[in-house]
């Protein structure tokens, strides 16, 4: 009996300790569950659960795989816009590129925050659109002081991806109206590998393209209106989504007025000074003419140094060519004046030479027939035709009168002839003083009306 009583005592003690242990375990479990309800999940645990290895998320597969295409909304913020080069026909721009899409696999409800800003290193863990710039010639990422990238995930699965880029984009230019031209430079955003069955780019509805406040360009005026278009590309590999923005840039003429137009205008006016210089001052007028021609040639070459070698004629080429033509014409004008003013000397020299030949010919005939009969000589010879009638008389002392011995007009003297040609030369200078400025004024009217008004309006109509 004592053994049985002892066994019962041990058994009751065992039950007691077992019950106490169970109660302690239940209390611990309830405490842990209460703690889990009061303390949220840590960010690390949450990210591991959302996109870690155990989450089942595969960054290689796009959202809605084998379903509707992913719509990616794009937005651009322009930090700087410049370095527009005519020779290479490109421009440089610094932008924030923002892309937004929905990935249902990243939707969450366990974490209290409405959005999560993640480290850029997490970009490798999620799917991203394969966007590239179709007209890009060069691009740079920014890593100072860290990668200039932003990744933000929202509760509903929306993903915001922003990156800072510096791009060099091609911009084919039409320089026919240079430097009064308006250029249109484009930026094309295209998918490289996903066709439109998988991915579609769209512009953001509100403020799709933003420009930094106070942004100015050295030579261009960036117009506020920007054309947003779709530029779907068709290749052998399929149809790919593409969107583009067009920037309208109007060139400012201030630099070219100061560096090209005004100097060439003054050179042309300077060439007209020779019209007021005495025609006898040949060294001064020739030096002035040659100097202005050479200066104008140098100016014309300088205007083409910063421009590409195109096959068509630009507005600045027409201006420089006409200015060079006026300067060269002023030099030719003095050549004409000098030629006319020296004509009297040539005429006197010609008369003197002709007179000497005539007298020599008459004397030669006279001596040839001096040995023949006097009657025959008188009947056959008539010296009046050679201007020697007063020197040779007939037998009766009367000067024979031939049919050509009429009343002759006395030629003008050397001084009179010189005065006539000098007056003609001065008249050329006088006419040039009025004709050259008038012709240049007419050219300016046509030039500026055509390029600054008519063609300017045509460009705006084409853009609209």
UniProtKB/Swiss-Prot annotation:
One MF term in the entry's GO annotations: transmembrane signaling receptor activity
Location of Phosphoserine modifications: 370, 379
Segments on the Extracellular face: 34-255, 304-314, 452-464
Residues the UniProt record annotates as site (Important for obstruction of the ion pore in the closed conformation): 294
Domain of life: Eukaryota
Effect of residue 379 to G: Loss of a predicted PKA phosphorylation site. Abolishes the conformation change observed after treatment with forskolin
Cytoplasmic side: 278-282, 336-430
Quaternary structure annotation from Swiss-Prot or TrEMBL: Homopentamer (in vitro). Heteropentamer composed of GLRA3 and GLRB. Both homopentamers and heteropentamers form functional ion channels, but their characteristics are subtly different.
Name of the protein: Glycine receptor subunit alpha-3
């Amino acid at each position: 009996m004592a053994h049985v009583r002892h066994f019962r005592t041990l058994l009751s003690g065992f039950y007691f300790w077992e019950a106490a242990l169970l109660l302690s375990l239940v209390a611990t479990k309830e405490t842990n569950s209460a703690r889990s309800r009061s303390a949220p999940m840590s960010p690390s645990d949450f990210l591991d659960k959302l996109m870690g290895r155990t989450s089942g998320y595969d960054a290689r597969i796009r959202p809605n795989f084998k379903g509707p295409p992913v719509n990616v909304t794009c937005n651009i913020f322009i930090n700087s816009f410049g370095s527009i080069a005519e020779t290479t026909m490109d421009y440089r721009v610094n932008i924030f590129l923002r892309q937004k899409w929905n990935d249902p696999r990243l939707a969450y409800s366990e974490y209290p925050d409405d959005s999560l800003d993640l480290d850029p290193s997490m970009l490798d863990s999620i799917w991203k659109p394969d966007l590239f710039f179709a007209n890009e010639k060069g691009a740079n990422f920014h890593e100072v002081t860290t990668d200039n990238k932003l990744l933000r995930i929202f509760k509903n699965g929306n993903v915001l991806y922003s990156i800072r880029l510096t791009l060099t984009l091609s911009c084919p230019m039409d320089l026919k109206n240079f430097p009064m031209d308006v250029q249109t430079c484009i930026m094309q955003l295209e998918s490289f590998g996903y066709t439109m069955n998988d991915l579609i780019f769209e512009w953001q509805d509100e403020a799709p393209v933003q420009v930094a406040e106070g942004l100015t360009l050295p030579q261009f005026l960036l117009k506020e209106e920007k054309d947003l278009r779709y530029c779907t590309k068709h290749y052998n590999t399929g149809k790919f989504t593409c969107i583009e923005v067009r920037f309208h840039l109007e060139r400012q003429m201030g630099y070219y007025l100061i560096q090209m137009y005004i100097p060439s205008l003054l050179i042309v006016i300077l060439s007209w000074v020779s019209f007021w210089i005495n025609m006898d001052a040949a060294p001064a007028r020739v030096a002035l003419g040659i100097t202005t021609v050479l200066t104008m040639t140098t100016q014309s070459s300088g205007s083409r140094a910063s421009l590409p070698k195109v096959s068509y004629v630009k507005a600045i080429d027409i201006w420089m060519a006409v200015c060079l033509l006026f300067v060269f014409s002023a030099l030719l004008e003095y050549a004409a004046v000098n030629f006319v003013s020296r004509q009297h000397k040539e005429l006197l020299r010609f008369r003197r030479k002709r007179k000497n030949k005539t007298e020599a010919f008459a004397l030669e005939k006279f001596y040839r027939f001096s040995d023949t009969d006097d009657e025959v000589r008188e009947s056959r010879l008539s010296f009046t035709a050679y201007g020697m009638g007063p020197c040779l008389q007939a037998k009766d002392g009367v000067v024979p009168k031939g049919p050509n011995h009429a009343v002759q007009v006395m030629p003008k003297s050397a001084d009179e002839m010189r005065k006539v040609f000098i007056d003609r030369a001065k008249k050329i200078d006088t006419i040039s003083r009025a004709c050259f400025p008038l012709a240049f004024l007419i050219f300016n009217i046509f030039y500026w009306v055509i390029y600054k008004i008519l063609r300017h309006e045509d460009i705006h109509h084409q853009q609209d």
